[in-house]
């Protein structure tokens, strides 16, 4: 069995008001149940990061990746399932009806577009020492500011 971390791709989807899209994971999910999260997931065998990013956006929202605005970061963590992961997160724009995402059935229960001053909501249902999704969001908003959006 490989000890290499699972590779993941994540999308911080930005709307025209400079808000970022988050979705709540279903309460029965093994990893981070009932927590807010960005769009993303594990790379399939043989898949490149950009391919996984495109696939995950469409699977989880029904939207189509239009362009990547920049990389937010590379995050190493161990999930509450005990598996090590390395996650590559990107700030992106998408094509589609941003008011009506098609959430992936059984995996997500609701969504929100958050402005930078609203990121504290991301701490809901998270372990007090976690803070990863909020840090990713804060770094995403910093990238947005750095590129003038």
Where are these regions (language model features)?
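Short secondary-structure boundary/capping segments
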Residues: 3, 12, 28, 82, ...
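Short connector loops at helix/strand junctions that flank enzyme active sites
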Residues: 6, 33-38, 83-87
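Conserved Nudix-box catalytic region and its N-terminal flanking loop in Nudix hydrolases
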Residues: 19-59
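A structural microfeature
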Residues: 22, 70-73
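Charged phosphate-binding loop/patch that engages nucleotide di/tri-phosphates or the phosphate backbone
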Residues: 128-149
């Amino acid at each position: 069995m490989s000890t290499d971390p699972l590779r993941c791709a994540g999308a911080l989807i930005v709307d025209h008001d400079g808000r970022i899209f988050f979705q709540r994971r279903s309460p029965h999910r093994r990893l981070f149940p009932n927590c807010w999260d960005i769009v993303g997931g594990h790379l399939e065998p043989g898949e490149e990061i950009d391919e996984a990013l495109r696939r995950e956006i469409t699977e989880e929202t029904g939207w189509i990746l239009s362009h990547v605005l920049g990389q937010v970061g590379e995050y190493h963590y161990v999930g509450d399932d005990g598996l090590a992961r390395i996650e590559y997160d990107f700030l992106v724009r998408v094509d589609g009806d941003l008011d009506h995402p098609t959430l992936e059935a059984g995996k997500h229960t609701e969504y929100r577009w958050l402005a930078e001053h609203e990121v504290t909501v991301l701490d809901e249902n998270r372990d007090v020492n976690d803070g990863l999704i909020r840090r990713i969001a804060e770094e995403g908003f910093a990238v947005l500011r750095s590129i003038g959006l």
